[in-house]
């Protein structure tokens, strides 16, 4: 058979094999076109599971008569025109294949009218050459696409369609995914003349939670942990389900990259890895997450149906998502470990009896939570949490057990000053409060703040917080506090620190002394959660403990090995102290009061001994009495 150019209809039918898998694929492509056209309302009519009719009507910008014929041509699009556009795609569609492919395997008509056009026009393609015919029609501003008798001319494809119920279930799932991607769009889905779904456009707040509950179910909303995380040009927000509620929620996984619904292995792996210590292998995590990334850093031109993407910095994206999910799960775990086991209540189902929430000491008193008329101070009532209790890990159980042993041995603190933990409801970032503070009778005498580091008043210099405690006011070094916290986090338990695998092993070039230290100190490195494999002049780094995930590992690990090669004492405590001292923040932005409150809360939880006897490098009490005396002297002189 000689080489020849395929007829347009046959070429489009071949392309349709990649783009049009089933009726749900048609719905996805057409609705994405409506979204790209700026529609705020989209009506979807389905008959017989999409095999008989798929009709998409929108109120978008519409298509002019001059361009209507081109809209059904292959490789015709208004969304990109240059290679630069292809490398920074911001629209959902860009290939210019969908309409041509769909029209080649169905009877497709498109009716459209833009704002500045007096009448509407209708286009349809027919014949072997797919010639486009245009005729006048009646239609409001917007576009309607009708797809009749899908796969009527490809019997083999039509034979592989499932039952009407199954095909409509796939369409319903596509509509759910789009409704989650765009809360500002009204979507209506009808099947055989009956309205099945109607998602009204909502703004921020409780209405957003109600729509989330309508799509994902009330159980997910009740156990959802709000997530917001940002690093440079990467940002992620959304909700992840508390691990103990996964069995009730079932399989629910929605992920979006720059507003595009996605099923990406890298993203799935990062989220699964974040849950690995909290879920069994057969239980998938539940989440609704939105990843925002510079369009130039992601290639969406990978799969014809645009289900997959390729990240230019895959490891960075993987670790970013992993860190964000791990952080929110750990914060919720710590918070719920100190709260009562009352089930969570979301914005969609509020508690019938509202309760105030007590702030931790460093955040200041919640003045609106005082009893209306009670002369005797009583202990604050525990607040409901947005995430149910999660079983703490071994390291948390042991350290919290030690803390409560100190509580039993110490004099009880006044009930009115007991702290309670609190986790924000879905839609707000998860925050963590500290545990009940340890009462120490001699703390105030020694200049320590008593049962906590006190309330953060302000930041008087970068890295220095001014706090108010029982004994007065004090300056707290946030840099030293962070070092103390990291040292505590890097102290390995009996079974060693948990090693967090890297997505891609890191190849490090080592000097002779560093290679020798790696060989002799392998047991210590294993205990610290560092998985280093010697390889001639190099070493492969496979895993690191969680506090080191965001570090510059190619620089830090060789420095650590040089330290081990020359150190006189090599044990876990000294190595943890060295790592804490050489830890560098990737974000050099100035400290905020919220960060100071969070840091001191974590330090009080993990290092209660520092609250009792703070080192001078951490806390410096301020003596305000000389200043007060001088003011009084000035007042007397002015009288």
From Swiss-Prot:
GO terms for molecular function: ATP binding; ATP hydrolysis activity; ATP-dependent DNA damage sensor activity; mismatched DNA binding. Pfam families: DNA_mis_repair (PF01119), HATPase_c_3 (PF13589), MutL_C (PF08676). Residues 370-392 have a biased composition (Low complexity). Residues 349-358 have a biased composition (Basic and acidic residues). The keyword Mitochondrion does not apply. The keyword DNA damage applies. Transmembrane segments: none annotated. One of its GO terms (biological process) is mismatch repair. Residues 336-392 are annotated as: Disordered. GO terms for cellular component: mismatch repair complex. HAMAP family: DNA_mis_repair (MF_00149). PANTHER family: DNA MISMATCH REPAIR PROTEIN MLH, PMS, MUTL, DNA MISMATCH REPAIR PROTEIN MLH1. This protein is involved in the repair of mismatches in DNA. It is required for dam-dependent methyl-directed DNA mismatch repair. May act as a 'molecular matchmaker', a protein that promotes the formation of a stable complex between two or more DNA-binding proteins in an ATP-dependent manner without itself being part of a final effector complex. Belongs to the DNA mismatch repair MutL/HexB family. This is DNA mismatch repair protein MutL. It comes from Edwardsiella ictaluri (strain 93-146). The lineage of its organism: Bacteria, Pseudomonadati, Pseudomonadota, Gammaproteobacteria, Enterobacterales. The gene is mutL.
